């Protein structure tokens, strides 16, 4: 600092101010120091740039993540909204075709249908109903859009002389497949049916249910749905014998889409099990019942005020709001005030496994309760055939013993024996016929009817798949009442020469059948002779 001051003081007086200012400036740094400084500055600047780029990328990433979160939340909300919408549709009872409780048809026509085997005849004044074959053909002739059929048997195309009606039915189904009519068929996986294979090749949709895997049982359901309007429910499957030597009974509903709305869900339940070896833990809401024994369908049947619902078995196949078959039968017996008439092929209150047989009290106990506690008259009409279990007679004797010392206890049992007629036939007649069997499965009371697919055997209800129908009517005196018609059918059979009060003998008495008419295709008629009073 002193040197610079000396230089400034010793400067010539002729030097300008600018020259003195330049002399006073510090010396320039060396080139090497300049390069180091430049590199350092460039490095700092590059780091600043990298930091700014990273910050911008981070902002973009955070922004993208926020957008993804928002989009995911919107998708979730949309999914929940769709689920709620479909849930609301299910609650309203609407199916995929737009059919709901609000727009379905509940003013219906109903008809009993029967198959009466050739050679089984009644008196001329007996009631008769629409032949089963004619009823089925009517349904197929009415079909314009769809035919849904559940059946345990599919044996229509047989060469036996009495199988002609089955062959005609098979030909009609084949014809429908070429008319742009949707055909959906359900059968048990054990069914080895050429009929099903032929229909499948023509475009029919076939579903096989593996009941053995589900519940160690088999499919016994038998019902039709045509055009989402018409329904058949009854004992007969698609077997040529059901149109020949088997005595069958069922009902057909016409223009009854409200009943279809509920029954279609059982069909959909069966279809949902296609390719599955186990039953789902929870059923879709679209398979929930629409009506049950607490919320019955209100409808008109032949202009008669009625209530109805369908039930299902086994309990494993009963989603929410679907009545179990046993509960449906209970509701009919509990509502009876005067009488309960039951017609089944087999009555055996036993549950059987491969190792043991145990008493199954569900229905047997309910009958005893009605007899003893409510003094309701009970009539049991049971088929007698080669497969009748000897224990049946023990249980019947046990039931009869209840009424021996109890006032107002009325129980009567008869066995409907059609094999006796075959035993009395000539050798030539036997070669032309198969053993006949009464396969009716129904119950009728003074206010209700139950038509099902099961005999009253424990394993049927606990293991097998079957469907039942309950109809309630207040006025059962009108001839249009399906309850009255079914009661008349029961009494026709009860008072016929085929029904015997005592245990049938395996040695047939052919003299009682000598006056029977020769086999004919005429409808059944009624035998009014030899009636016992109902109050007995």
Task: Give the predicted meaning of each segment.
Residues 2-536:
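Charged, low-complexity intrinsically disordered terminal segments
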